[in-house]
């Protein structure tokens, strides 16, 4: 099992001062969170979520990535990897290393990080994920979730609220999915790492009038925003980053957008590590948000009155666009060009609707 340790050294006086300052600030703001000041220096211990050791051994993706019917291993990765770049895939598909006499996968699935089970979907036909588990990781900054999908069965003793340890067996690999399932020969684990958009998901879902019941509450896939697990794992293995906070801090900005609002979304209250500067003591007047190529809002800057002067409340303004990356990620619609300027595209609009409650 892959597990690397890193011991960070801190100056006690400086750490104590930062803790006291953070605590004072949280009391002033009346907020229930603060960020551990040493979190940028801590190195995560994590594990690959299946018995397939190919990635740990440095072998190519064909040794572990389960392709679609196309047969292309790239189609099992994260990003615009399907339908000639026109379809987004929000995770990694990991093939099995063991099968029984019937050809069914026997691989056990491991918790990639210590955490708390937040959701288990036990009715495979109700989601494209099939049977899936979501684990939140409160000990990580920010508190990302990991998702494990297309499972055959859940391990006995694993339930919502269960605390799981690093590498603990949580399930068995399968090929469950809505809409008829996945052929046994293409059984795999679909693995995601990401952030939850909003605790107000039910309001957005009702407003959208999809015509079907939300069977999965907050852990509906539409409320989950993934990062590229392989990119993070590569950077972690190469020691370019030690943890998720460093990874988000180094993320590439593709679209920068301003939202004129006095709201502080629950998203940034849950993930305060994404703040680029402290919240003001009073109300905010707006937000400047940096998004990566898939629309993940990874950097947040609160704005004061002077920075949104003359702008209509609840309005959205594109500040900058890295056009080459937008073109490369054509499976995502982050912006639409309007002459010499840009407006929000469909995927960016959805993210802002979810997080800010814009309607």
Please provide the spans of the model-predicted regions:
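N-terminal secretory signal peptides that target proteins for export/translocation
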Residues: 1-21
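Bacterial N-terminal signal peptides
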Residues: 25-37
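Surface-exposed, glycine-biased beta-strand/turn segments
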Residues: 41-131, 215-358
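Short helix/strand-bridging catalytic loops that position acidic/His residues to coordinate divalent metals
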Residues: 95-98, 146-155, 175-180, 210-216
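Non-catalytic surface loops within mature trypsin-like serine protease
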Residues: 96-98, 139, 153, 191, ...
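Zn2+-dependent peptidoglycan hydrolase active-site motif and core
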Residues: 104-106, 112-155, 182-184, 188
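Short, well-ordered loop/turn sites that connect or cap secondary structure elements
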Residues: 112, 158, 163-164
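Conserved, short, structured surface segments that act as functional micro-motifs
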Residues: 127, 132-135, 162-240
């Amino acid at each position: 099992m892959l597990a690397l340790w890193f011991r960070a050294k801190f100056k006690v006086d400086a750490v104590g001062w930062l803790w006291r300052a953070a605590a004072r600030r949280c009391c002033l703001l009346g907020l229930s969170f603060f960020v551990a000041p040493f979190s940028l220096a801590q190195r995560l211990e994590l594990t690959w979520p299946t018995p397939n050791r190919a990635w740990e051994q440095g072998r190519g993706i064909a040794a572990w990535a389960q392709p679609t019917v196309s047969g292309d291993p790239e189609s099992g990765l994260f990003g615009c990897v399907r339908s000639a770049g026109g379809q987004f895939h929000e995770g990694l598909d990991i093939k099995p290393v063991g099968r029984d006499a019937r050809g069914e996968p026997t691989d056990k699935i491991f918790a990639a990080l210590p955490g708390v089970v937040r959701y288990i979907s036990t009715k495979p036909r109700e989601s494209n994920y099939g049977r899936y588990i979501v684990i939140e990781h409160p000990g990580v900054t920010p508190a990302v979730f990991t998702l494990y999908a297309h499972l055959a069965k859940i391990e006995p003793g694993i339930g919502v609220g269960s605390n799981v340890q690093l590498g603990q067996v949580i399930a068995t690999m399968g090929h469950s999915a809505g809409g008829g399932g996945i052929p046994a020969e293409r059984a795999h684990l679909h693995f995601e790492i990401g952030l939850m958009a909003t605790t107000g998901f039910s309001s957005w879902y009702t407003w959208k009038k999809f015509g079907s019941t939300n069977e999965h509450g907050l852990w509906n896939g539409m409320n989950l925003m993934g990062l590229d697990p392989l990119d993070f794992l590569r950077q972690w293995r190469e020691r370019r980053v030690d943890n998720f906070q460093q990874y988000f801090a180094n993320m590439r900005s593709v679209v920068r957008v301003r939202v004129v609002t006095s709201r502080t979304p629950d998203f940034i209250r849950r993930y305060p590590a994404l703040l680029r500067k402290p919240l003001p003591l009073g109300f905010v007047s707006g937000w400047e948000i940096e998004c990566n190529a898939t629309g993940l809002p990874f950097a947040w800057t609160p704005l004061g009155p002077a920075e949104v002067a003359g702008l209509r409340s609840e309005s959205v303004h594109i500040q900058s666009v890295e056009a080459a990356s937008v073109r490369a990620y054509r499976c995502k619609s982050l912006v639409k060009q309007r002459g010499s300027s840009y407006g929000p595209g469909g995927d960016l609009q959805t993210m802002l609707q979810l997080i800010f409650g814009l309607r």
